[in-house]
């Protein structure tokens, strides 16, 4: 098959560097490499040079950090979405945004196809492709890992050598990682055995090892407006600055390490270690404020929504009608989530040190054990009689034979 232009999600790694000449060989096409900056702090000039060296006709470096935080991270934070009780969805949130940028450039360049370097075993192939199908239904999608017969890193290096492309990729001796402004993930090597405890001195790249910390407790205050963090210690920051600041503080105190065996969308279990320092702090603070501001029914129902929201994000269904509808519900709940949370960070732990809100539903006069004017304790008897009536009726009707009244 011959194509005119293919837009490739390019990272600068070995896989996507091999894909460029492979696409040109198999589709006789021009390859446009797209690098989306979601906070991975790579050397983008070196990546651009590598893309051209491997045969790209054009390279886009897209700064998407602010969009990532405002349009993906904060809506997920407001939802309280955590996959399987642990994973804060760092990679899952980034993939739909990257795919969206690929679609935008494919339209701009009038491309025939979009290609990606996700393997046939992982979740990312699904996340990329369902997003592309949602936003550009008729464009062709190319997934080389499901097509070519290159089976190993050595095969890929040999392929580049055959093409006369000399790039100094080293033998794989480190973990498979994914990095953005929200998190850093680690998979592979000894982590593939769930019985092995991670060697934090070897694994961790951002967060300090909590077992060797000698830090002092640090108090911070985070102010929220409609569920969105806007200030740290009274200082207003833009979304990227705020998250970077909390990443730094969390990392210094050993906060945000998650070791999880998770259920992949494609049917297998995988084990990963995630570093999410700022995200862990924000989730904790946001939840503390919701305890203060949301009524019981809303808080409890929102917990169910959070589970489904997390599954949708994990599965790559960011642009689905259901995710958008759930976000509308979440936004309504967050209208009253305003206020400040005070936290203490210390040796891998977060401690709540106080919270306040103009929308606080906590009324001291109601909660006090002392005599008060707002709550008549005698009213409780009638409430209990009505609340317990269904159980009383069930007990009367289904009373076992021989039971005494």
Swiss-Prot record:
EC number: 6.3.4.5
Alphabetical list of SUPFAM superfamilies matching this protein: Adenine nucleotide alpha hydrolases-like (SSF52402), Argininosuccinate synthetase, C-terminal domain (SSF69864)
Catalytic activity as recorded in UniProt: L-citrulline + L-aspartate + ATP = 2-(N(omega)-L-arginino)succinate + AMP + diphosphate + H(+)
Residues that bind ATP: 9-17, 117
GO biological process, one term: urea cycle
Origin superkingdom: Bacteria
Keyword line: Amino-acid biosynthesis, Arginine biosynthesis, ATP-binding, Cytoplasm, Ligase, Nucleotide-binding
Primary location: cytoplasm
GO cellular component assignments: cytoplasm
Molecular-function annotations in GO: argininosuccinate synthase activity; ATP binding
Pathway connected to this protein: Amino-acid biosynthesis; L-arginine biosynthesis; L-arginine from L-ornithine and carbamoyl phosphate: step 2/3
Residues binding L-citrulline, per UniProt: 87, 92, 123, 127, 176, 185, 262, 274
Residues the entry annotates as binding L-aspartate: 119, 123-124
Pfam family, one: Arginosuc_synth
Subcellular location: Cytoplasm
Oligomeric and partner information: Homotetramer.
NCBIfam families (alphabetical): argG, PRK00509.1
Protein family: Belongs to the argininosuccinate synthase family. Type 1 subfamily.
Listed HAMAP family: Arg_succ_synth_type1 (MF_00005)
Protein name: Argininosuccinate synthase
Organism of origin: Caldicellulosiruptor saccharolyticus (strain ATCC 43494 / DSM 8903 / Tp8T 6331)
Annotated gene: argG
């Amino acid at each position: 098959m011959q194509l005119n232009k293919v837009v490739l999600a390019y990272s600068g790694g070995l896989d996507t560097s091999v894909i460029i000449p492979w696409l040109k060989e198999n589709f006789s096409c021009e390859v446009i490499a797209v690098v989306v900056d979601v906070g991975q702090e790579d050397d983008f000039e070196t990546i651009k040079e590598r893309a051209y060296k491997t045969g790209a006709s054009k390279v886009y470096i897209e700064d998407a950090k602010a969009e990532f935080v405002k349009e993906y991270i904060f809506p997920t934070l407001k939802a309280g979405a955590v996959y399987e009780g642990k994973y804060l969805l760092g990679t899952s949130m980034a993939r739909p945004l990257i795919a969206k940028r690929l679609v935008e450039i494919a339209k701009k360049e009038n491309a025939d196809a979009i290609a990606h370097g996700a393997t046939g075993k992982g979740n990312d192939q699904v996340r990329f492709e369902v997003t592309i199908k949602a936003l550009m239904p008729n464009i062709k999608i190319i997934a080389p890992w499901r097509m070519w017969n290159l089976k190993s890193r050595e095969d890929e290096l040999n392929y580049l050598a055959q093409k006369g492309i000399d790039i100094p990729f080293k033998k794989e001796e480190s973990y498979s990682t994914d990095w953005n402004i929200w998190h850093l993930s680690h998979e592979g090597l000894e982590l593939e055995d769930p019985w092995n405890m991670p060697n934090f001195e070897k694994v961790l790249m951002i967060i300090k090892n909590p077992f060797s910390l000698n830090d002092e407790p640090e108090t911070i205050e985070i102010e929220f407006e409609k569920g969105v963090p806007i200030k740290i210690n009274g200082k207003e920051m833009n979304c990227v600055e705020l998250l970077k600041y909390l990443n730094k503080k969390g990392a210094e105190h050993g906060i945000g390490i998650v070791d999880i065996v998770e259920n992949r969308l494609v049917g297998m279990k995988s084990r990963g270690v995630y570093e999410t320092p700022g995200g862990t702090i924000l989730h904790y603070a946001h939840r503390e404020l919701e305890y203060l501001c949301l009524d019981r029914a809303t808080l409890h129902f929102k917990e169910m929504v959070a589970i489904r929201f997390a599954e949708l994000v994990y599965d790559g269904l960011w642009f689905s009608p259901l995710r958008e509808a759930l976000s509308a519900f979440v936004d309504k709940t967050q209208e009253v989530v305003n206020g400040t949370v005070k936290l203490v960070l210390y040796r891998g732990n977060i401690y709540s040190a106080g919270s306040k809100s103009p929308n606080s539903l906590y009324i001291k006069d109601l909660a006090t054990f002392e005599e008060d004017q707002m709550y008549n304790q005698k009213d409780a008897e009638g409430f209990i009689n009505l609340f317990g009536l269904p159980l009383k009726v069930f007990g009367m009707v289904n009373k076992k034979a021989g039971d005494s009244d």
